[in-house]
């Protein structure tokens, strides 16, 4: 059975609402035979990543970057999960991967730097972006929760085949 790993940093009620919607979408009744594993970013391991067939990542935008918790996750799993480094030690490109991923980011004013920072690291993993990035600014309402639900459902449905 394919496994979808959801890794998130949800320190506020707004971000937790998005996370809950993503998880609910991944568990949609119309999607069968996909195991959904949810891990806070500080608890996710390389084994979780290696045992998954697809990924959903959630983070806040903090000072123009992803959350420290999600960065810690990447620092912890990067090499073991197949990440490529360049000669100067920065993330290199593996040329596109097979495992699908999606991303949601919540910020107050701007999410650009957070999205860019995640994509630069993920670009060096054997993963491929399988859905539009969900970028949410400010309050989280029904429209934002619906988009998060759709993101979760999209990745789970891709794995279900």
PLM segments and residue spans:
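N-terminal beta1-alpha1 ligand-phosphate binding loop
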Residues: 2-30
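Charged catalytic carboxylate motif
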Residues: 3, 14-18, 69, 117, ...
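Short histidine/acidic/glycine/proline-rich micro-motifs that form metal-
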Residues: 12-13, 105-110, 136-141
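Glycine-rich phosphate/pyrophosphate-binding loop and the adjoining helix
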Residues: 29, 128-161
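A short beta-strand-loop structural module common to alpha/beta enzyme folds
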Residues: 29-45
């Amino acid at each position: 059975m394919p496994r979808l790993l959801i890794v998130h940093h949800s320190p506020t009620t707004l971000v937790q609402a998005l996370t809950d919607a993503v998880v609910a979408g991944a568990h949609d009744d119309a999607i069968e035979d996909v195991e959904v594993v949810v891990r806070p970013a500080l608890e996710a391991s390389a084994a979780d990543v290696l045992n998954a067939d697809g990924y959903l990542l959630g983070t806040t935008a903090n000072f123009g970057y992803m959350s420290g918790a999600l960065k810690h996750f990447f620092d912890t799993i990067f090499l073991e999960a197949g990440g490529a480094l360049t000669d100067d030690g920065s993330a290199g490109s593996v040329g596109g991967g097979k495992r699908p991923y999606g991303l949601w980011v919540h910020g107050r004013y701007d999410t650009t730097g957070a999205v860019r920072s995640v994509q630069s690291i993920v670009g060096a993993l054997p993963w491929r972006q399988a859905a539009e990035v969900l970028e949410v600014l400010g309050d989280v309402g029904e429209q934002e929760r619906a988009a998060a639900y759709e993101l979760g459902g999209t990745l789970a449905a891709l794995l279900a085949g």
